[in-house]
Swiss-Prot record:
Protein name (record): U7-lycotoxin-Ls1f
Signal peptide boundaries: 1-22
Family membership: Belongs to the neurotoxin 19 (CSTX) family. 07 (U7-Lctx) subfamily.
Gene Ontology CC terms, in alphabetical order: extracellular region
Species per Swiss-Prot/TrEMBL record: Lycosa singoriensis (Wolf spider)
GO MF entries: toxin activity
Length: 78
C-alpha cells in the first residue's frame, strides 16, 4: 500500500515539474516581438535591441525588438 502511495506521489511530482517547465518556456518573447530593455524575458539566444526614432528632427519614441544575440542593424548609405 505504501509503495502505491509513494509511486503516485512521485508521478504527480514529475508531471507537475514538466508542466511548470513548459509554462516557463512559453513565457519568453520570440524573435521579432516588441520588448523592453528587460533581458530576462528573452528566449534563448535572443537579446533586446533598441533604437530611437526621429521624424523631421523630433524624437518619436524608442522601439525595441527581439533579435538574435550579436546581430546588428545599420542604416544603409544612400
Amino acid at each position: 500500500m505504501k509503495l502505491i502511495i509513494f509511486t503516485g506521489l512521485a508521478l504527480l511530482l514529475i508531471v507537475s515539474l514538466i508542466d511548470v517547465e513548459a509554462q516557463n518556456e512559453g513565457a519568453c518573447l520570440p524573435r521579432g516581438s516588441v520588448c523592453t530593455t528587460n533581458h530576462a524575458s528573452c528566449c534563448s539566444k535572443l537579446s533586446c535591441d533598441c533604437y530611437r526614432r526621429f521624424e523631421k528632427g523630433v524624437e518619436k519614441g524608442q522601439k525595441c525588438w527581439r533579435i538574435p544575440t550579436g546581430l546588428r542593424y545599420s542604416k544603409e548609405k544612400e
